Structure formats: structure tokens, C-alpha cells
Amino acid sequence: MKIAYFDCAAGIAGDMCLGALLDCGVPLEYLNRQLQALGIEGEYGLQVSRVQRCGQPALQAVVEVLGSQSGGSLARHWAEIQALIAGSQLSPAIKARSLAVFEKLAQAEAKVHQMPVEEVHFHEVGAVDALVDIVGTCIGLDWLQVERVLSSPHPVGGGWVSTEHGKLAVPVPAVIELWEMGRVPVFSNGVEAELVTPTGAALAVALAEEFGPCPPMRVEKVGRGAGAQELPIPNVFRLWIGEANGGELTETVSVLQTQIDDLNPQVIAYTCEQLLALGAWDVFTQPITMKQGRPGILLTVICPPDRVPECQDLIFRETTTLGIRHFQQQRTLLERVVERVETPYGLVDIKVARHHGRIVNAQPEFRDCVARAQEFHVPVQTVWLAAQSAWQNRLQG
């Protein structure tokens, strides 16, 4: 599986992403040709140059707005952006990623300006440079065949910037909204400047599956995109491209644990159900012996890091616990796909796991087996065996 890791130690912006992708080998001619599908080629020019930031070489991509738009941003409503991208000849994958980024950006700007998303039509969402940066980044990721994006935490920066709405404190409101939307971990690197732009934040929030350390991977390429400012640190966004180790996938999970010895077991069962409904990946209990020999249970919840606050709130609300331990761990997953087979009882999904490209496990989806068994009034094991047989016949056929 091809992975892209956004290294945002000095920040992230749309033009920095574009520069890093070009530095990774995305052909400029290919990028320009793909961007022509938007029908805005007469509105901008894309200039690329090799520069240095604090002695580090990087590629700087600059979108120059041409003609009547050079004095300001092109105002387009969110619906126009949707139509422009959806109606283009770009691939479905590029369209989906581009629209996801613009949707996050529009939602953030709408919240900042207290207006419906449909009415958003100001500088960020309508600007030609944002279109080129966002769609161009998605084109580049597609060319590199990136299947999964992860990101480092974001630096908060500081100071003030001038905008159409006057001077704004850094980070600007739209970036803060995007960070809140994506539960992005942030830190201070001591630099007083705008380090994360709304476009850069939207790209990370929409495309990255999680924020944290670089995952285990075999590094194939590292692209460096230069920011426009000269800073006390190298103003460079680094894009790591590589293959997940052994075809496996490693991700960060949060683990919550608490011991309980004074709660109705029926409430514990209900709490487990609610935690799963809230987005926890797994919830289980173990019998333990607590102080003074009292029998109790250890409740363990495994969830995405961004679900920790909601899961903690639910545990405090529904149980008698006075404290919850939480920590992060890495888990390794096999590459998994779902395939569908035809049985005498209807369609059943098969969950297939691969290790180093070799199938190591294939199991019928039990819920499908139950549904087909109830529909045809046969034992669930009969449907399960029929699905396994259909899968084996496909492999041998």
C-alpha cells in the first residue's frame, strides 16, 4: 500500500503541497494538462523554481492569477466549485478527493462567517490559486498512486496577517475551525508567522486518516515544497512517499481502561453497546479481583484517537467510575478487502486478508449469513459453508 506522510514541522500550505509533489517527480506537463480539465487555464499561470530555505533546497510553486482576477479573488459559490470539479474530465478519485477538501474548507469558512455553506463565495473557496493548489495536489497524489495519507501535528504559528477582513490573529479563524473539525494535534515551534493556511489545513484534515508520528514504511521519495516566507527555520513542507512495510498497515489507536466493582452488569452491557455505536473499534470486559477481595471488571475500549473525548464522556456518564486511564499504541493490520460471492441463498460478502500479497484468511461476513439464513429458513452454518464453498470455487476457477 502506497502511503503519503505530510511532515508539517514548518507548516503546510496549498502551494507547498504542490511544490513537494512536483519535487517527488510528478511531471509539470502532466499536472498542467490535467488542470486544463477545470477550464480555468486562462485565469492563472503556474511558475516553479528551485530555491533554498535556510540552506535547504526545495521546490517553490507559485500560482499567478492573470487578467481581471489579478486584483482580487474570483468569487465562486460552493455550488459552482462542486459543478466545476464534478463536471470535469478528471478521474473519479481526483474528483472525490478535491471535493472533500473544498467541502471541509467551505464548512470552516461558513462557520467563521455564520452563513450557510451554500452562500460561501469569498476569497478562499473561490480563488483560482486555491483551485489549482487543491485540485493540483489531488492530481499529484493520484499520479503517485497514493492510497493512504497521514500527517504530523501542525505548528500554531503566531502574529498577525492582513486579509480582506482586516488584520487577523494567527492562526486565522478558518484554520482553527478546521483543526477543531479534524481534531488536529497542534504544537508551537516558536516561530511567529502564519505557518498553516486555510487551504493547507483543509488538505490535511480532508485527506489524512490520522495525525501522529510517521508510520513504519519503506521510504521511496521525499519531496520538499518551499513556503513563500523567509523564516528563522527552513520554511519547507516535506512529503514522504513510501510503501507500507510488508504490505501491512500500522496505525495509532487509543486505549481507555477503567476498573468497576459497584455497577449493575446490565448497565455495563449497555455502556459497551453505546461505545461501539459511538465509533469505538472494540470494547471488552475482563473479570478481576479488586481491593478487599471484591470481584470487579476491567473495561477496555479501543478507539480512534479523535474519539477519546466522546468515549470518556460516555463512560463517566453511564458508569460509576471515578477515573479512566488512556494511552496510545500502534497496531499492525493486514491488507484487507471485501469480495462478494453468489450462493444458493443470495449474495454474501467475504472478508479477505493478505500478507505479503498472499491470502492468509478469508471469512464470510457473519451478518450476511444470518440475514440469508433467516430469509430462507435454513441453519446459519449452511449459508456459511455455502459461502466458503463459493469462495473456494472462485479461487480454483
From Swiss-Prot:
Similarity field: Belongs to the LarC family.
The name this protein goes by in its record: Putative nickel insertion protein
Keywords on record: Nickel
GO molecular-function term, one example from the UniProt record: nickel cation binding
Cited NCBIfam families: nickel pincer cofactor biosynthesis protein LarC
InterPro entries attached to this UniProt entry: Ni_insertion
Pfam families for the chain: Ni_insertion
Domain of life: Bacteria
Keyword Membrane on entry: no
